[in-house]
From Swiss-Prot:
The active site is at K117. The gene is ligA. It catalyses: NAD(+) + (deoxyribonucleotide)n-3'-hydroxyl + 5'-phospho-(deoxyribonucleotide)m = (deoxyribonucleotide)n+m + AMP + beta-nicotinamide D-nucleotide. NAD(+) binds at D34, A35, E36, Y37, D38, S83, L84, E115, R138, E174, K291, K315. Belongs to the NAD-dependent DNA ligase family. LigA subfamily. It comes from the Bacteria. The keyword Transmembrane does not apply. PROSITE patterns: BRCT, DNA_LIGASE_N2. This is DNA ligase. DNA ligase that catalyzes the formation of phosphodiester linkages between 5'-phosphoryl and 3'-hydroxyl groups in double-stranded DNA using NAD as a coenzyme and as the energy source for the reaction. It is essential for DNA replication and repair of damaged DNA. InterPro entries: BRCT_dom (IPR001357), BRCT_dom_sf (IPR036420), DisA/LigA_HHH (IPR041663), DNA_ligase (IPR001679), DNA_ligase_CS (IPR033136), DNAligase_adenylation (IPR013839), DNAligase_N (IPR013840), Hlx-hairpin-Hlx_DNA-bd_motif (IPR003583). GO terms for biological process: DNA repair; DNA replication. Residues 589-671 form the BRCT domain.
Length: 671
C-alpha cells in the first residue's frame, strides 16, 4: 500500500467508524455488529501505530484516552452558561407564564418547549469546521475547566459532525450515567475495594474530572444536548427546530421526551405526566425545563444577571417513603464525634434502596421525638441524602425504645465528653480504632492525599491485620502486605503502591487538609499553606500570628496550635517525614497595596464574576470573604444587594459600586 492508498484507507476507516458510531449512539440504528465495528477499529489502530503521521484531531482512536494531564486549564465561555430559575409548585409555573405574557404585552397562549431536566453535569462542546475542538465544564457560568480529552472518550459525543454542519457551533449538554450502568459501576468498585459513588450525578462529575482520560474512557458516560452558545450562519426560528438541526448534525438530543406545547395548561399537564412516569426512565431526572419556543421572542425577553427570562426549571417535589426504625446505631468520626444513625427496614426511595438515614445529633432526635421501633417518613433531600423528616406517632405500640446520650465510646469504650456549645459528644481516646479508620479514609481521599485504589474495604483489612496504626504506616506497606488483603491482586497492589508513592509530594494545602485538623477545611488549609509557606513555619506559629490572618478566628487558631502541641501528632508528622512525605511548599503571599484588606462582594454582579473579583483582590494582596464583620474593610455591592449591604452600613464599612471597585483596581495596578 503506497502513501496515497494509506491516506485514502485511513480516511475511509475514520468516516466509516464515525458513521457507525452515530448510527449506534445517536440514531439507535446500527448497521453492523459489534465484532465488525471492532475489526474496523483494530485496522485503524494498526495503521496509526505504523504511520503515526496519519493521526488527526478527528481520529476515532481518541475515544481510548490521551496522555494524563497535570491540571485542567480554564476555558472561558463566549456566552455565559446561565442557571435557571426554579419553580417548585404549579402556581409558580403559572406565575412564570404570566410574567412572560406581561413582558410580551400579549394575552395569547405562549408556545413552549418542555424537556427533561437531566440530573447530570452540564458541559459545553465547541465544534470548528465540524470537528470537536474544545470541551469544558460549566464552571461558574463564565469560565469552565477544559476537559476536551475526557469528553472525546464518550461514545455518544461525535468527534465529527455530519451533514452540512456550521463552521462554528457551541453546544450545551448534560453528561449522565444510566441507572443500570451506575449500579454495575458501583458493584465493580465494591469488588475492587474502592469507595462507591453516592449517586449517578456524582459518578458522572467524578469521571469527567479525571486528569487521566483513560479512566474516563472506562466509565459509562452518555450525553443529551439541549442548546447552543454560538452558531455561525443561519439560525433556526424556534428551539424545537434547533433541536432537530442538532440531531441531523449527529448530536444526541432527547427528542423522545421533548414536547412543543401551546399554553401553560398543556405544560402543567405534561409536568404531571412526567412525575408519574419518572420511575420508568432509565436515568435520573429531577424535573422539567420549560423554554419559550420562538427564538426571536427569547431574544426579546432577554436575560437577568444569572438567569434567562424565557426559561424555568420545574423541580419535582422530594420523594418520600414510610418505613420502620429497626435500630439507632452510634457512628464515630475521625474527630471523635459520635453521631446517631437510623437503621431502617429497607425501603425504595427515588429508585434507590434506603436502609440508613442520618439523625445528626441528640437535639435532632429530641426534636423529631424518634425512638427505635418508630414508623417514620424518610426523604432523600435533593433526591440524594436520606433523612428522617417525620415520626408517625399514631403507629406506636408501647414497645419503642429511646437512645440515651452515650457515656462511653461505642467503638473503644473510652471516655466521652460533650463540650459546651457542641451538639455531639466526642470520644477522647486518640487510639480509638473507629477514629483511626475514619482518619485514614479522610487522609487518602481524593481532595486530600488522593491515594487512588485505597478503598474502605482495603483499609478495614489493613487495620484488622494491624499493618497500619497511623497514616504514616501507609508509606511502609509492601506488596506482600497488600497481597494479604482479599480481592487485591498482584497488579492492583502494584498500582496502589505507585499511588501511595505519588502522594508524597502533594501540595501543602492538600496535606494540611488530609491531616484532619479540626475546623480546618479545604479553604482554610489552602489559606494557611499560602500564608506560612511550609509545614515547619505553620507548626511553630503562635496563636497571635494565626489570629492576625483574616478568616482565622479563636476557634481555628486554638485548634491549629493544639494540634501541633500534641506529642502524638508530632510523632506522626515526624514519621511521615522519615517515610519521605514532603508536601510541596507554597510561596508565602507577597505584599501588595491591598495587603491586610478584606473585601466582601454582595448582590448580582454584572461586570465580573465572584471568582474574577476574588482573583483581582488577591492579586493585589487582599482577601475576599463571604461574610461581613468588623474585620471587613470594603463591601462591593451589585444589583439587589441585601442583608450584607445593610450590615455594612450599620458597621460604617466603605461601600463601592462595581464601577468604583474596577476604577480602584485599575488605579492600584497602574501605581
Amino acid at each position: 500500500m503506497d502513501k496515497a492508498q494509506r491516506i485514502r484507507r485511513y480516511q475511509q476507516l475514520c468516516d466509516e467508524l464515525h458513521r457507525h458510531s452515530r448510527l449506534y449512539y445517536t440514531y439507535d440504528r446500527p448497521e453492523i455488529t459489534d465484532a465488525e465495528y471492532d475489526r474496523l477499529f483494530r485496522e485503524l489502530l494498526e495503521l496509526e501505530k505504523a504511520y503515526p503521521e496519519l493521526v488527526t484531531a478527528a481520529s476515532p482512536s481518541l475515544r481510548v484516552g490521551a496522555s494524563p494531564l497535570s491540571q485542567f486549564t480554564p476555558v472561558p465561555h463566549s456566552r455565559p452558561m446561565l442557571s435557571l430559575e426554579n419553580a417548585l409548585t404549579e402556581d409558580e409555573l403559572y406565575d412564570f407564564d404570566a410574567r412572560i405574557r406581561k413582558l410580551l404585552a400579549s394575552d395569547a397562549p405562549v408556545r413552549y418547549v418542555c424537556e427533561l431536566k437531566m440530573d447530570g453535569v452540564a458541559v459545553e462542546l465547541v465544534y470548528r469546521d465540524g470537528i470537536l475542538s474544545v470541551g469544558s465544564t460549566r464552571g461558574d457560568g463564565t469560565t469552565g475547566e477544559g476537559i476536551t480529552e475526557n469528553l472525546r472518550t464518550i461514545p455518544s459525543i461525535p468527534l465529527v459532525l455530519s451533514g452540512e454542519a456550521p463552521a462554528l457551533l457551541e453546544v450545551r449538554g448534560e453528561v449522565y450515567i444510566d441507572l443500570d450502568d451506575f449500579q454495575k459501576l458501583n458493584h465493580e468498585r465494591e469488588e475492587e475495594g474502592l469507595q462507591v459513588f453516592a449517586n449517578p450525578r456524582n459518578a458522572a462529575a467524578g469521571s469527567l474530572r479525571q486528569l487521566d482520560s483513560a479512566v474516563t474512557a472506562k466509565r459509562p458516560l452518555k450525553i443529551f444536548c439541549y442548546g447552543i452558545g454560538q452558531l455561525s450562519g443561519e439560525h433556526p426560528a424556534s428551539h424545537h427546530s434547533l433541536l432537530k438541526c442538532m440531531h441531523r448534525w449527529g448530536l444526541r438530543v432527547n427528542l423522545e421526551h421533548s414536547r412543543t406545547l401551546e399554553g401553560i395548561e398543556q405544560v402543567t399537564d405534561y409536568f404531571r405526566q412526567l412525575q408519574q412516569r419518572r420511575d420508568e426512565l432509565p436515568y435520573e431526572i429531577d424535573g422539567m425545563v420549560v423554554k419559550v419556543d420562538d427564538l426571536a421572542l427569547q431574544r426579546e425577553l432577554g436575560e437577568k444577571t444569572r438567569t434567562p427570562r424565557w426559561a424555568i426549571a420545574c423541580k419535582f417535589p422530594p420523594r418520600q417513603a414510610v418505613t420502620v426504625v429497626e435500630d439507632i446505631v452510634l457512628q464515630v468520626g475521625r474527630t471523635g464525634a459520635i453521631t446517631p444513625v437510623a437503621q431502617l427496614k429497607p425501603v425504595e426511595v427515588s429508585g434507590v434502596t434506603v436502609s440508613r438515614a442520618s439523625l445528626h445529633n441528640w437535639d435532632e432526635i429530641a426534636r423529631l421525638d424518634v425512638l427505635i421501633g418508630d414508623t417514620v417518613v424518610v426523604e432523600r433531600a435533593g433526591d440524594v441524602i436520606p433523612d428522617v423528616v417525620k415520626v408517625l406517632t399514631e403507629h406506636r405500640n408501647g414497645q419503642e425504645r429511646s437512645v440515651p446520650l452515650p457515656q462511653s465510646c461505642p467503638a473503644c469504650g473510652g471516655p466521652v465528653v460533650k463540650l459546651e456549645g457542641e451538639v455531639v459528644p466526642r470520644c477522647q481516646e486518640m487510639s480509638c480504632p473507629a477514629r483511626l479508620r475514619e482518619s485514614i479514609k479522610h487522609f487518602v481521599a481524593r481532595r486530600a492525599m488522593d491515594i487512588d485504589g485505597l478503598g474502605e474495604r482495603t483499609i478495614e483489612q489493613l487495620l484488622k491485620r494491624e499493618l497500619i496504626k497511623s497514616v504514616a504506616d501507609l508509606y511502609h506497606l509492601t506488596k506482600e502486605d497488600l497481597l494479604l488483603c482479599e480481592r487485591l491482586a498482584d497488579k492492583s497492589a502494584e498500582k496502589l503502591l505507585t499511588a501511595i508513592a505519588a502522594s508524597k509530594t502533594r501540595p501543602l494545602g492538600r496535606f494540611l487538609f488530609a491531616l484532619g485538623i479540626r475546623h480546618v477545611g479545604e479553604h482554610l488549609a489552602s489559606l494557611l499553606a499560602r500564608q506560612f509557606g511550609s509545614l515547619d513555619a505553620l507548626s511553630h506559629a503562635t496563636r497571635e500570628e494565626l489570629l492576625a490572618i483574616h478568616e482565622i478566628g479563636p476557634q481555628v487558631a486554638d485548634s491549629v496550635t493544639d494540634f501541633f502541641a500534641k506529642s502524638r501528632n508530632r510523632e506522626i508528622l515526624a514519621a511521615l517525614q522519615r517515610a519521605g512525605v514532603a508536601p510541596q511548599a507554597e510561596e508565602k503571599r507577597s505584599g501588595g497595596p491591598l495587603t491586610g484588606k478584606s473585601f466582601v462582594f454582595t448582590g448580582s454582579l454584572t461586570r465580573f464574576s465572584r471568582k474574577q473579583a476574588q482573583e483581582m483582590v488577591e492579586r493585589l494582596g487582599g482577601r475576599a470573604s463571604g461574610s461581613v464583620s468588623k474585620k471587613t474593610d470594603c463591601v462591593v455591592a451589585g444589583e439587589a444587594a441585601g442583608s450584607k449591604l445593610e450590615k455594612a452600613r450599620q458597621l460604617n464599612i466603605q461601600i463601592l459600586s462595581e464601577e468604583e471597585f474596577l476604577q480602584m483596581i485599575d488605579t492600584l495596578e497602574e501605581a
